[in-house]
């Protein structure tokens, strides 16, 4: 099994693309079940103001599956963090604005702990340090639900995709549901299961106090994957400055279902004039 960072050009392996020519660099990292096309509605807007870097996470169906090592990526997010740091180094990027969606939000946090100079600002979109309830912490899922998810992915992957996509994206947005269902369904089932285990078993609550890079936490008003309370948990536990912005929309993918609303919030967050 090859390692992404030892493959030669990690930028090529992860299908990196750069848009715009702004003076500041904005890195967009997609979440589970997506690929870089998740940003297609926001890209034309953001590229007017920034040099925007997009890429595919290693679990994406667009990446050579030989690069996905379950032993490396299933146990924790270290493999993903290694990849992100290597990717930014390869492109000679530092002092970037990083927008990570869902699990990629925590990957950005972990990378910022290791190499804080790579980032000036972390934008955590629909991110969570832990998805499973734990005592007084409400993550949104009970362990039994997560175990059932693993079982469904393993036994009837496409059936699970068709059931999970509308729940995650929000029943009322057919375009967002269709987009997510398409990319999720293109994943190889064994990779989808392995990556799901990495996400749902993750617990980075103890890492949050080490995150010193300023954070903006953006969360949909209603999200069945990440409860609104998690956004405030992150704000109250990171080590650096943080603010929460709640979007008046539904679903785990506001970049698909409410991109104009999200862009307005990003303009405000990043102090874009015009």
Model-derived segments and their meaning:
Residues 7-14, 53-99, 103, 264:
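Active-site loop/oxyanion-hole signature of alpha/beta-hydrolase fold enzymes
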Residues 12-69, 87:
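Conserved HGGG/HGGXW glycine-rich cap/lid loop of the alpha/beta-hydrolase fold
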Residues 30-32, 96, 100-102, 220:
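Conserved alpha/beta-hydrolase "nucleophile elbow" surrounding the catalytic nucleophile
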Residues 109-114, 118-155:
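Flexible "cap/lid" loop of the alpha/beta hydrolase fold
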Residues 133-141, 151-209:
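Conserved alpha/beta-hydrolase catalytic His-Asp/Glu region
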Residues 211, 217-219, 223:
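Short beta-strand/loop motif that positions the catalytic acidic residue
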Residues 228-252:
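Catalytic histidine neighborhood in serine/cysteine hydrolases
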Residues 250-263:
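Catalytic histidine-centered segment of alpha/beta-hydrolase-like enzymes
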């Amino acid at each position: 099994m090859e390692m992404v960072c030892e493959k030669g050009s990690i930028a090529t392996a992860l299908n990196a693309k750069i848009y715009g020519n702004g003076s500041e660099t904005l890195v967009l990292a997609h979440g589970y079940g997506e690929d870089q096309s998740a940003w297609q509605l926001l890209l034309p807007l953001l590229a007017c103001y920034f040099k925007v870097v997009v890429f595919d996470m290693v679990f994406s169906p667009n990446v050579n599956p030989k690069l996905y090592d379950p032993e490396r990526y299933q146990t924790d997010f270290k493999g993903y963090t290694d990849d992100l740091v290597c990717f930014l180094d390869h492109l000679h990027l530092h002092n970037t604005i990083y927008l990570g969606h869902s699990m990629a939000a925590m990957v950005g946090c972990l990378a910022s702990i290791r190499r804080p100079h790579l980032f000036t600002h972390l934008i955590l979109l629909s991110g969570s340090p832990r998805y499973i309830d734990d005592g007084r912490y409400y993550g949104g899922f009970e362990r039994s639900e997560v175990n059932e998810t693993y079982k469904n992915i393993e036994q009837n992957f496409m059936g699970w995709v068709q059931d999970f996509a509308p729940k995650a994206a929000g029943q009322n947005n057919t375009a967002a549901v269709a987009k997510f269902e398409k990319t999720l369904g293109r994943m190889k089932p064994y990779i989808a299961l392995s990556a799901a285990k990495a996400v749902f078993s993750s617990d980075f609550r103890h890492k949050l106090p080490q995150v010193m890079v300023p954070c903006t936490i953006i969360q949909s008003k209603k999200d069945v994957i990440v409860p609104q309370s998690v956004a405030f948990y992150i704000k109250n536990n990171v080590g650096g400055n943080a603010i929460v912005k709640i979007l008046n929309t539904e679903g785990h993918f506001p970049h698909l279902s409410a991109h104009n609303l999200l862009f307005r919030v990003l303009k405000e967050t990043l102090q874009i004039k015009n």
